C-alpha cells in the first residue's frame, strides 16, 4: 500500500541506513542522511578517505574518486528517499524491496573528488508515480558542485 510519510525524522545515521539500503562494503556509498523531506528532497554525505580500496588503482599517486561511484552514491541516496517516502523507516519492509536503476541522464562531472573530501549528495524528487521515481540533483564538496545527474529508478520486490 502506497502512503506518504511526511513526519519522518530528518537525520539518519549509518546504523539506520544499513537497515534500509541493501548495499554493503565496498559498495555502500552513504555515511549519513542529514536532511530528508518525504516526497521532496534529501541531503546525505560520504566521507572520502585515502583508505578506499578504489584508490589502489584510480589512480596510483593521484587518487581521484571515480565519477561512476559518485553517481552510484546519488542513486543510493535517492533510493533511500523513495523508500522512506513510501514506507517510512521500516526495516522489515526494506528486507522485501530493492531499488533498480532505469535511466541515468544529464550526467556532468565538474571537479575531481579526492581523499579528505566530504562528498554531499543533494537530490530532489522530479517525478513520482507508483514505484517509479525520478530524482535530480548534485554532488558537492565544500559547497561546490562536483557532479550532477538525473536518475530514474523503480522499487521492486526483492527475490
Swiss-Prot record:
Any idea which UniProt keywords this protein has?
Cytoplasm, Lipid A biosynthesis, Lipid biosynthesis, Lipid metabolism, Lyase
Q: Does the keyword Lipid biosynthesis apply?
A: yes
**Gene Ontology CC terms, in alphabetical order:** cytoplasm; membrane
Instruction: Give the location in the cell.
Output: Cytoplasm
- Active site, UniProt feature: 58
Q: Tell me the Gene Ontology biological-process terms attached to this UniProt entry.
A: fatty acid biosynthetic process; lipid A biosynthetic process
Q: Which domain of life is it from?
A: Bacteria
Give the reaction(s) catalysed: a (3R)-hydroxyacyl-[ACP] = a (2E)-enoyl-[ACP] + H2O
**Chief location category:** cytoplasm
Q: What EC number(s) does its UniProt record assign?
A: 4.2.1.59
Question: Which top EC class is named for this enzyme in its record?
Answer: lyase
Could you give a GO molecular-function term held by this entry? (3R)-hydroxyacyl-[acyl-carrier-protein] dehydratase activity
Pfam families per UniProt: FabA
What this chain does, per the record?
Answer: Involved in unsaturated fatty acids biosynthesis. Catalyzes the dehydration of short chain beta-hydroxyacyl-ACPs and long chain saturated and unsaturated beta-hydroxyacyl-ACPs.
Family indicated by similarity: Belongs to the thioester dehydratase family. FabZ subfamily.
Q: What is this protein called?
A: 3-hydroxyacyl-[acyl-carrier-protein] dehydratase FabZ
Gene that codes for this?
fabZ
Amino acid at each position: 500500500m502506497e502512503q506518504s510519510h511526511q513526519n519522518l525524522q530528518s537525520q539518519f545515521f549509518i546504523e539506520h541506513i544499513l537497515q534500509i539500503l541493501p548495499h554493503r562494503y565496498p559498495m555502500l556509498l552513504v555515511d549519513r542522511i542529514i536532511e530528508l523531506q518525504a516526497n521532496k528532497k534529501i541531503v546525505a554525505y560520504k566521507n572520502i578517505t585515502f583508505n578506499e580500496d578504489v584508490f589502489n588503482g584510480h589512480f596510483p599517486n593521484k587518487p581521484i574518486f571515480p565519477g561512476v561511484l559518485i553517481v552510484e552514491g546519488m542513486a543510493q541516496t535517492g533510493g533511500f528517499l523513495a523508500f522512506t517516502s513510501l514506507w517510512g523507516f521500516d526495516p522489515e519492509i526494506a528486507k522485501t524491496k530493492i531499488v533498480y536503476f532505469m535511466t541515468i541522464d544529464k550526467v556532468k562531472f565538474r571537479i575531481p573528488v579526492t581523499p579528505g573530501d566530504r562528498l554531499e549528495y543533494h537530490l530532489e524528487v522530479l517525478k513520482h508515480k507508483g514505484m517509479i521515481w525520478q530524482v535530480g540533483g548534485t554532488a558537492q564538496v565544500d559547497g561546490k558542485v562536483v557532479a550532477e545527474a538525473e536518475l530514474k529508478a523503480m522499487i521492486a520486490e526483492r527475490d
